[in-house]
Regions:
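An active-site-proximal "capping" alpha-helix that borders the catalytic cofactor pocket
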Residues: 69-81
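Metal-dependent nuclease catalytic regions and adjoining charged, substrate-binding loops involved
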Residues: 78-157
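Short acidic-hydrophobic sequence patches enriched in Asp/Glu that either
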Residues: 68, 72, 118-121
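Non-catalytic, well-ordered alpha-helical scaffold segments
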Residues: 33, 71-74, 143-146
């Protein structure tokens, strides 16, 4: 399937570990930790970061464009480029859906764009989360209250 999608390529890394300093976060020393499933390099000199996702039938358009899902690849790209000193213009990101129940086309690869604006937005979300963690600001998700054992008790946060 990779040959069909990418043509001629070489495997650059498998299960690459990222432990990169988050330079955008100044309140504390923090590293971004991630594991990239596969990085290939195509004959045009581009790197392709691929993240495997298991599913039953595939993803609808809403899930394919969900920020919190696609930002994972955006941040992988940012920190991969930081680690290897690679120009982000030479890196593309993709999800590879491994469909358990599909009879045909049980692997689907699709590109996720990660330009400068999206990278900035993903980084901002990451930094804001780290600020809240550092300051011990716990955001309450009221949608989860009904199932909580502390719902409407004095221990309710």
């Amino acid at each position: 399937k990779l040959d069909e999608h990418f043509g001629e390529y070489e495997v650059f890394s498998v299960e690459e570990q990222l432990f990169e300093k988050i330079n955008d976060f100044s309140l504390d020393k923090r590293d971004f930790k991630g594991y990239i499933d596969l990085v290939i390099k195509t004959s045009d000199g581009k790197y392709h970061i691929i993240d495997w996702k298991s599913c039953s039938w595939g993803w609808d358009a809403k899930k394919r464009s969900d920020k919190l899902i696609t930002y994972q690849l955006t941040l992988y790209k940012k920190f991969f480029c930081q680690k290897h000193d690679v120009d982000p213009k030479k890196v593309e990101t993709h999800f590879a859906l491994l469909k358990r129940t599909a009879k045909k086309e049980n692997v689907e690869i699709f590109r996720v764009t990660s330009g400068p604006k999206k990278t900035s937005n993903a980084t901002e979300l990451l930094v804001n989360a780290l600020v809240h963690i550092k300051r011990k600001n716990h955001v309450k998700n009221r949608l989860s209250c009904r199932g909580c054992e502390f719902y409407k008790t004095e221990q309710c946060p």
